[in-house]
Amino acid sequence: MAAREGECDQRTEEERAIDDWLPITSSRTAKWWYSTFHNVTAMVGAGVLSLPYAMSSMGWGAGVTMLIISWIITLYTLWQMVEMHEMVPGKRFDRYHELGQHAFGEKLGLYIVVPQQVVVEVSTCIIYMVTGGKSLKKTYESLCSDCREIKLTYFILIFASVHFFLSHLPNFNSISVVSLAAAVMSLTYSTIAWTAALAKGSDGHVDYGPRGKNTKDNVFNFFNALGDIAFAYAGHNVVLEIQATIPSPSKKPMWKGVVFAYIIVALCYLPVAFIGYYIFGNEVEDNILLGLNKPEWLIAAANIFVFVHVVGGYQIYAMPVFDMLETYLVKEIKLKPSFWLRFTTRTIYVALTMFIGMTFPFFGGLVGFFGGFALAPTTYFLPCIIWLIVKKPKKFSFSWIINWVFIILGLMLMTLAPIGGLRNIILSAKTYKFYQ
């Protein structure tokens, strides 16, 4: 194994020292099950709670179809990325942009992948800031309904304070316990969401018709729902970084972990989406827990579990950003790797995502907008494009056809989903007061 890792290694001692300091490449001791809970934490999160809302905007036929097709497409594209991680002997593509550079060239690959990956990871951290704050607020209101109202801003600040500490853990393997807890919480609160909805039961007058007041509303709601579903399958942006933590050869253990992760994802997503929509119909909230008021202790517990999960999710998505920033500072700016460099960089990043989350907490609209604009390319069709370039399947073969079909579907998703999300943000902004 050591020989495999060292094969064709032409790095200088200084380059090795830097790589041993950077968060993505500093530790390669992970087991296959690490990839399971890292991927579950990356994928299952805020998105699962919005799936019944997405169903209400699409109806049974389109909703069920989109959820299942998205599960299949994203499992396929994730498999492609796992396959390509070590396709060049003696080299590992430890970061998404490194794979892009191999396919498109040094400069073009960087320009294509990095902006999209940064948008995905930073926007996800912002959304998790909002989700964590809202979950704490809902917990507070459930346990103390007669207490004085506290602004959402303060709950987001509490969530951020956790990350001012956790963000200084050095690498992926150092946050494994946090990620494992988050993965367990995701399955737990998903189960609570659909079982509590089932226990609540239907009032017998559930409407499964379009939730909009007119055709225009229904069209925009449909577009936003596409973004909700895209956001629910978002782990691709960190999959190579997760695989980088596994010793070489990493393909088999990584894929084993991914398969288990996707089974857990299905157990989380499908019951929440289908049962939540069945119980509430088109009256469902954009976060299903907001519509469940009793028993209050159970809803409070579910919201605490959401809080724990998005704490782990934030760290999973922040780590590649930390790696990018620290790589740039030590390799391009030539700053010396140090505790204070890492401390300053990560503290500023957490503060920035906290500020944006406090200022623009439009949860439903944010999911739709970022889901279509940024997550669709990096999750649905960029792996297919890279696969066609590097693997060169025969024209009109099954592999060639299926990749082009997924590319077209991904482009449609990228085009349509942000329209609905942006409209929801605008509508929310009309009545929103800053830092309320």
How would you label these PLM feature ranges?
Residues 46, 71-80, 159-168, 383:
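Central hydrophobic cores of alpha-helical transmembrane segments in multi-pass inner-membrane proteins
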Residues 48, 57-58, 168-169, 247-248, ...:
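Helix-loop interface residues and adjacent transmembrane-helix termini in multi-pass membrane transporters
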Residues 51-59, 172-173, 365:
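Short, hydrophobic transmembrane alpha-helix segments
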Residues 54-90:
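Extracellular loop-to-transmembrane helix junctions
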